[in-house]
Amino acid sequence: MLTPILALTALALIAGALLGFAAVRFRVEGNPIADQVDAVLPQTQCGQCGFGGCRPYAEAIAAGEAEINRCPPGGQDTVQTLADLLGVEPLPLDEERGEAPHTPQVAWVDEAVCIGCTRCIQACPVDAILGAAKQMHTVLKGECTGCGLCVDPCPVDCIHMVPVDLDLAEWHWPLPQNDTARREVA
């Protein structure tokens, strides 16, 4: 009775040691440049750049497959920060992708008009819209990134982008990085 238990324990220890060695030996490192670029992007996950989100866009920039000027939510400030980070010339913002918002915006649902079709919920990349089929929907203001992807799918046009008051009670966007923090990322 004791022999099978000891044999299985020994096999488990050997398999665990082999898996541990393989995890260390064959570890896949992430691209540190893509990590730095991703830290600069606004994380709206809007897809206006032509990629599925901010991380795929950062990986394309790091691989040299995409220009640094394709992020309308980040605006020209993000283009300048990316140019400084990568040591390239800043390009003007690609206006074909959309305009940079002058003030942060969030989605607002006119609940009296909402028919509960759930199309906006499916379109939201950050799950900032609450609701169920045939029920009214609402936007979690603190979670909304202002990408606007929920506006077009709405069949009754009850979703509007409204500016956010820029006071301390409503400020949910990351503060601008100073030069010291930027050097730590680099």
UniProtKB/Swiss-Prot annotation:
Which of UniProt's keywords are assigned here? 4Fe-4S, Cell inner membrane, Cell membrane, Electron transport, Iron, Iron-sulfur, Membrane, Metal-binding, Repeat, Translocase, Transport
Enzyme group, top EC level? translocase
Co-factor: note: Binds 3 [4Fe-4S] clusters.
What's a single GO BP term from this record?
electron transport chain
Organism whose genome encodes this protein: Alkalilimnicola ehrlichii (strain ATCC BAA-1101 / DSM 17681 / MLHE-1)
State its role: Part of a membrane-bound complex that couples electron transfer with translocation of ions across the membrane.
Q: What is this protein called?
A: Ion-translocating oxidoreductase complex subunit B
* Ranges for domain 4Fe-4S ferredoxin-type: 105-134, 135-164
**Cellular location(s):** Cell inner membrane
In the UniProt record, what gene is named as encoding this protein?
rnfB
| The organism's taxonomic lineage, starting at the top | Bacteria, Pseudomonadati, Pseudomonadota, Gammaproteobacteria, Chromatiales
Q: Identify its protein family.
A: Belongs to the 4Fe4S bacterial-type ferredoxin family. RnfB subfamily.
Q: Which GO terms describe its molecular function?
A: 4 iron, 4 sulfur cluster binding; electron transfer activity; metal ion binding
Necessary cofactors: [4Fe-4S] cluster
